[in-house]
Amino acid sequence: MQEGYNVRIYEQAPELGEIGAGIQTSANAVKVLHHLGLADRMAEVSVKPKAFEFRLFDSGEVMHKVPLAEEHEEQHGAPYYHVHRSDIHQILADRVLELDPDAVVLNSTAIGFEEDSDGVTLLLSDGRKIEGDVLIGADGIKSSIRDQIVGVTEPNFTGQVAWRATVPVEKLPKEFMDKIVAIWCGPKKHAVVYYLRSGEVLNFVGCVENSDWQEESWTVKASWEDLKADFEGWNDEIQIIIDNIEKDECYRWALNNRKPVDNWRTDRAVVLGDAAHPTLPYMASGAVMAIEDGAVLMRSLNANDDIAAALEMFQRNRLDRTARIVNGSTELGDLYHLTSKAEFEKGFERRNIAKERNEWLYAYDPMTVELI
């Protein structure tokens, strides 16, 4: 829209509201948000973590560290932020509506599309048909647009589930945790803890190997007692966090992914984000990839008069990078769930996370990278 395109966003929800909790945005995504004029608003609602600290689940010993904060910004040209999902949604929605007050259409569920050489028609569940020049499917892991492009395949259940909850900092001991990302690693599970909303809220995500729970929705509540049992015997810091979570505010969902594919497009339609390359959350790059996708798609459309050529350029420049992140995230799940200190030490020695992330993950700039 900022580039002059006439855009309509069809959203299945009846209203734009809060869902989910924290997301992490590294410099490679934040540069795009800055391009959209959102630097000040992002800084207002976010937290800049000092570092990733990978800790042993019981002793809390730090096994590996990735510096962030000033070092990340100096090296990569933009901050590393933690932000509440609803805050970044609101910031983006406000910017969209500033550009065009009629851009967002609610209560609109996509079920497929039709296309020919003259255009593409989005089909909605209530019978509406929306005509346009190009269709961008950003409708998640169960994307109906993806199904039509790639073929209908079920997402792969990984045998892992994720817990999420938040705790207001006033419920925690004073100076409970520094402003870091603490990743607690242990047998068959791990936990990720960091601050949100200018440090007012602590975000907790716990990933557990559990093949019994296959509910995919992020909004389904589960038993606090089950959460407590999943992390029995873990460090006192984890116990303090769990003990201060509201018992009726525990959410649990199954972690699904798909193997990378080599086509996301037709001549007039394309998918991006989770609709194209859903991933496990272990590289904290799911939202980041979607933001990168948007930037590269915009640049591809600007560079080509022919829509099919633009979509091909977008795909050509995104397939390898997103596949690397998807596969790398799966591998990290194995590393985080080893069973002994000795295994963790060997694992982190083999895989220098700080080095690899700084060399290729964070160094990528979707606004300036050469498109081929």
Predicted regions mapped to residue ranges:
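Acidic/histidine metal-binding catalytic segments
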Residues: 44-47, 103, 233-249, 307-312, ...
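Conserved mid-domain beta->alpha element of the FAD-binding
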Residues: 2-14, 136-137, 163, 193, ...
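C-terminal auxiliary extensions adjacent to catalytic cores
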Residues: 351-372
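A short, Lys/Arg-enriched amphipathic alpha-helix followed by its capping loop at the start of a domain
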Residues: 1-5, 32-35
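A short coil-to-beta-strand element that immediately follows conserved catalytic motifs
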Residues: 105-106, 157-159, 176-180, 201, ...
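Conserved N-terminal helical subregion
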Residues: 28-168, 211-224, 228-230, 366-372
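Active-site substrate-recognition segment that forms the wall
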Residues: 179-214, 220, 224-233, 255
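Conserved N-terminal glycine-rich FAD pyrophosphate-binding loop of Rossmann-like flavoproteins
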Residues: 14-34
